[in-house]
Structure formats: structure tokens, C-alpha cells
């Protein structure tokens, strides 16, 4: 199904508004979801709206929730998300952090009790657009674990994404590293299961602990587990994310004494800085440009057009989706059913 970006945003806004989400919050969520689809992250795009309906119906997300600063020490801020939509809460927190970097050159910010923050690269792009560098870790609580620790056969962690982003010179797209510490994100597994497509080898184990490519294994009565990317390396980063985001924010970790209500709650730890403070911008730009050209000059492997740096993939996808979105038929059917159940008009092609 091909629809315009305007229609896609309006559909998302209308679906959320029909569930008593305030207009400004619905706008932020809709914009974030559509941008995720444009970037090629369909697992964090419009396809997730049925999950948000479930969360709203179960009172697991606060439709009115807004970020509140509970500790302000100038270059250190702690926010509480009040269980609100992460795409709105996260945007508010990032805007506050960016303003502090403008004042002080750097900022550490934490956020607790946010509903699903969405695509973490979105916040990295916000920082990069302001000319700043971001490094963030996120943990996921209030749900059952879905990622097995290295050497384990059952889940003990969640997908705990990390993000690194910063501006690039000469009009190049920003550098954006946005990765789950699992081999694939849980929402990616959800999309694969919905589309009936196999998961990559080495990304999932079944309930018996054996490898499988059946993504639906993650959503059955006896679910399996995602594996950490890179074995012990991804596992270690997942543990770091759990402690930085879960403990330093005050939001908690996935350990079983904390609630597991069934709907993802995110905690965030982020560092932002102005890269122009220490060294001259001219030298920095020239050095980054030389490094990028060095990467681009790498002879490509068989079947590969060219080597890219992280962030170029998203930028190319966004350029291709400058006016319209191509939505998978199975995902579109789910959106149609959701809209019709809320008496929301469905756009036509």
C-alpha cells in the first residue's frame, strides 16, 4: 500500500486522538513513527500502533504523560516520564539537553518511566542537527526478558539499545549508530513473524535452547529468546545499558523484584557534548572528511555497491521516501482493522 507522508501522519494522529491522546503528543508520536518508516525501520514505524492500542486499553501507557525534571544540577538533569509516550517524552528531554549543551558545552541526562521511546536514532539525529554528539544507553523494564545472556538458554535481559550520533561535514548525513544489543530487535522479530519471514541465523533460540529461524517462536505460549549480537560482546554492552540506564536514572533494572506488567518501559542514560569546544572546527571537519573518504574508497566486497558509514543507509531510505510510504500489505491490514475499530477514516491510495 502506497500512501503520502501527509496521509500517514494524519492516520497515526487520528488513531491516537481517538484514544484520548492530546494533540501535541499525538503529533510527536505520529511524526516519529512516519520518520522511522521513512528511514527503513518499519518495526518502529506505523506497524507498532496496534501494540500501542493494547497498551492504552490496558492503562500501561499514560496518554497525558509528560516529562518532568526531578533533579537539575546544570549539566546533569534527571527526568521522570510519567509513563507517557516515549516519542513525546524523549523529544522533550532531548530538547532540554540540547539547550544545556548550548549553555555549557556538555550535558548528562537520564530519564526514567517512559513508555517505548521508539527509534533511538531519532534522538541522535536531533542532537546531530544541533551540531552535537550523543552517546546513549537504554534499558527496557516492566516486561518479561527476551534476550538470553551469553552462554544462557533462557532470557534474562531485554534488547537494551545503544545510540551514537554526531554531525558530519560538507552536507553529509549525520553519523547515526542505532543498534539493539540483541542480534535483532524484538520489534523486528514481531514484523518478521507478521510477514511470515525467517529470522537471521544465530538471532533466536527456541524454548528448548536450540537455534531457530522461526520468529514466531518469540511470541508463542512457550517463547524462546533472542541472542545478543556478537556473543559475549553484545551481552556485555547489554549489561552496561542495564546498569547505566536502569540504575543511574532511578528507574530500575530487569531483575525480577521489579514489576513486569507486560508493556515496555524505557529508562535512558545519555551524554551530549559540543565537539567544537576543544579543537578547531576547520581541523575537525577536514579530519572527518578525510576519514569518510578513506572508508568510501574501500574496494567493495562481491555483491556490494559501496562501503557506507553508519547513517547513510537511513539517509538514502529517507530520500527515496520523500513523498510517500510503501507499507507492507500485512501491516496495512492490521492498520486498517485498528482504524476501523476506532471509527477512524482510512486513507486510500
Swiss-Prot record:
Query: What pathway, per the record?
Result: Fermentation; pyruvate fermentation to lactate; (S)-lactate from pyruvate: step 1/1
| UniProt-listed InterPro entries | Mal/L-sulf/L-lact_DH-like_ah (IPR043144), Mal/L-sulf/L-lact_DH-like_NADP (IPR043143), Mal/L-sulfo/L-lacto_DH-like_sf (IPR036111), Malate/L-lactate_DH-like (IPR003767)
The ranges of region (Disordered) come to: 199-219
EC number of the protein: 1.1.1.27
Task: State the compartments where it is located.
Answer: Cytoplasm
Please indicate if the UniProt record lists Transport as a keyword: no
- UniProt GO MF annotations: L-lactate dehydrogenase activity
Q: Which SUPFAM superfamilies match?
A: L-sulfolactate dehydrogenase-like
Q: Which domain of life does this protein belong to?
A: Bacteria
Catalytic function, reaction form: (S)-lactate + NAD(+) = pyruvate + NADH + H(+)
- Read off the Pfam families from this record: Ldh_2
This protein's record includes keyword RNA-binding: no
Q: Which residues cross the membrane?
A: none
Q: Name one GO cellular component term.
A: cytoplasm
The UniProt keyword set, sorted, is: Cytoplasm, NAD, Oxidoreductase
State the family it belongs to: Belongs to the LDH2/MDH2 oxidoreductase family.
The protein's name is L-lactate dehydrogenase
Tell me which species this is from: Cupriavidus necator (strain ATCC 17699 / DSM 428 / KCTC 22496 / NCIMB 10442 / H16 / Stanier 337) (Ralstonia eutropha)
